[in-house]
């Protein structure tokens, strides 16, 4: 193997400036989901809407109320407990992480 040819400092600098290296890959910008602006205080209008709409849902959980009614999770949990106490909805499955309800059938 023949010895490498030694370049002068000027030649090395010129080679570096020639742009032989690839530029770094730019990561594509992803669309960011906007922060949800859900209600955190239960006013009379929201309460009336919960009492009117929730009994018509076949499947009721905290996430369903958050998505459809644009309320916070803690407010949705309080509303579900209230509706269960009133007998408007009945539990299907309840444990510490998730509570699933359905509408109470008229008997």
UniProtKB/Swiss-Prot annotation:
Q: Any S-S bridges, and between which cysteines? A: none
Task: Please name the InterPro entries in this protein's record.
Answer: Ribosomal_eS25, WH_DNA-bd_sf
Which residue intervals are annotated with compositional bias (Low complexity) in the record? 8-20
Zinc is among the record's keywords: no
Tell me the segments the record calls region Disordered. 1-35
Q: What residue spans carry the Basic residues bias annotation?
A: 21-35
Keyword Ribonucleoprotein attached: yes
UniProt similarity note:
Belongs to the eukaryotic ribosomal protein eS25 family.
The protein here is known as Small ribosomal subunit protein eS25
């Amino acid at each position: 193997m023949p010895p490498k040819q030694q370049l002068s400092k000027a030649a090395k600098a010129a080679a570096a400036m020639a742009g032989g290296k690839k530029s770094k890959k730019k990561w594509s910008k992803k669309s960011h989901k906007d922060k949800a602006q859900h209600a955190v205080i239960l006013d009379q209008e929201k309460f009336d809407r919960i009492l009117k709409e929730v009994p018509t849902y076949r499947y009721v959980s905290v996430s369903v109320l958050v998505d459809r009614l644009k309320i916070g999770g803690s407010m949705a949990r309080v509303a579900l407990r209230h509706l269960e106490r009133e007998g408007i909805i009945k539990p299907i499955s309840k444990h510490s992480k998730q509570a699933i309800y359905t509408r109470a059938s008229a008997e």
